[in-house]
Amino acid sequence: MTFQRPLYIPFAGPALLESPLLNKGSAFSQEERNNFNLTGLLPHNIETIESQSTRAYQQLSSFKSDLDKHIYLRNIQDTNETLFHHLIENHLEEVMPLIYTPTVGLACEQFSKIYRRKRGLFVSYPERHKIDDMLQNATKQNVKVIVVTDGERILGLGDQGIGGMGIPIGKLALYTACGGISPAYCLPIVLDVGTNNSQLLADPMYMGWRNPRITGEEYNEFVDLFIQAVKRRWPEVLLQFEDFAQTNATPLLNKYRDQICCFNDDIQGTAAVSVGTLIAACQNKGEKLSDQRIAFLGSGSAGCGIAQHIVRQMQREGLTQEQARQRVFMVDRYGLLTDQMTNLQAFQQPLIQYTKDLSHWDISSHIGLEQVIKQGNISVLFGVSGQPGLFTQEVVESLCANVDHPIVLPLSNPTSRVEATPKDITTWSHGQAIVATGSPFPPTLYENEYIEVSQCNNSYIFPGIGLGVLAARATAISDNMLMAASQALADASMQYEKVKGALLPPLGEIRPISKSIAYAVAKQAIADGLALPVSEETMQRRLVDNFWAPKYRTYRRTSF
């Protein structure tokens, strides 16, 4: 057991109890109560964190709605972060959907109505000349991980304005719960650039800047002001872009990925976990990913990010880039992306199919999903459309006509946006389809047997990436580091005995998996020249040192 030195604390009395990072509540020892002027401010009995956590779980269980449970958990987080994470650690699979998807979507929609206490930074456009001051005002000084959103594309719910702050808060809770990154190092930020959500603009309770969103040069200049201020304040920070609209997501990532250590979880994290899951699914079939022919319904930044990651994996398995791209088909509401289409976005261009290569297809001018599945002999289908019900029975039956065990990945979230439910896919495929989803679903009952549904959840990936970056002290995140994360996840999934249908280990095992991913990411950072070389022993020690556990430390009073 690692020895922890006492913490020397300058706060006392009510100020100490008001600090979420330091508050122990009823677990302050008698000596600490005497030394920190807490006598009489707490009930007499001195409790352990285990007994506190038991009470908190009983209270949590008494709430009926998931939103009420989310609000309760956030209240604990804002009063005692150590207890909050102890509770999560002991009930991870049950609590994760409450602090993140799908419940966080409703919390974002209701943000201004359920707001109780400040957390993170609200960087608003009208106060853009004070960004340096805002960063200085952060209650956390040694920030190592920032998650930032502008609230424009929150899950599948669209523009939520500053309500999008719920996403960085939830995401950083998972960095700690799954990746062991201390909450003292984590800072959620929302860029308040207005909102085009008419309901929010008309809502007297809305707490953000009541103005239509700024766009174009105004927007880009504001984001740049923010990025440069972050670089001045915390030059070695890991910055995660979260839930930006696709018109901004890829350009911002491309612009800043060589200026600051950053990544976009919607594009790169989703891609990494999706490819890791797909590799695991192919291994279950005794096949390689490069054997597959893959269709995407949805060609936004997330879908294209996954597709590009798949192309890179196929190249690692021996295909040329051209061969790999010919096996990936992107479909949106206008049909298959081809060289005949105009007004495609820059990130879509590398993934088009050339009509000369489709000359043998029996097609009309509009090439829809079913035609792509039939003519393209598709074996894997991704759903990243954000539109429910688009994977119909006919679509699934067409897949089954191509291969015995098609892989179907409806990844849109929250649950209300999924392209098809696992139950329907299993029924329509007569139990033959291999399924993973983006949101949590219960096991599917088919022919008196329960089939587990793996959640292709970014939480399997981004905490490990973050931990690996911190341990390696990497200056950037390369595509190779993301590929290493995907392979590490697939390898980890093969090491666990899984129930029928499961492609990934249980989420309850995510902390050791994050350590494995972190080590792979750190090694690749060194190989790519993005971190200084260190011995394996040193890297393992850094991973241990950076892996925070929710335990109370002994406090000593700072002397002046």
From Swiss-Prot:
Catalytic activity line of the entry: (S)-malate + NAD(+) = pyruvate + CO2 + NADH; oxaloacetate + H(+) = pyruvate + CO2
PROSITE patterns listed in its UniProt record: MALIC_ENZYMES
One Gene Ontology cellular component annotation held by this UniProt entry: cytosol
Positions annotated as active site in the UniProt record: Y100 (proton donor), K171 (proton acceptor)
Annotated keywords: Metal-binding, NAD, Oxidoreductase
Binding site for a divalent metal cation: E242, D243, D266
Cofactor(s) for this UniProt protein: Mg(2+); Mn(2+)
Important for activity, annotated site positions: D266
The protein's Enzyme Commission number: 1.1.1.38
InterPro entries: Aminoacid_DH-like_N_sf, Malic_enzyme_CS, Malic_N_dom, Malic_N_dom_sf, Malic_NAD-bd, Malic_OxRdtase, NAD(P)-bd_dom_sf, NAD_malic_enz_proteobac
Pfam families, per the entry: malic (PF00390), Malic_M (PF03949)
Molecular function per GO: malate dehydrogenase (decarboxylating) (NAD+) activity; metal ion binding; NAD binding; oxaloacetate decarboxylase activity
GO biological process: malate metabolic process
Positions bound to NAD(+): R153, D266, N413
Cofactor details (free text): Divalent metal cations. Prefers magnesium or manganese.
Quaternary structure (record): Homotetramer.
Family membership noted in the UniProt record: Belongs to the malic enzymes family.
Protein name stated in the entry: NAD-dependent malic enzyme
Organism: Psychromonas ingrahamii (strain DSM 17664 / CCUG 51855 / 37)
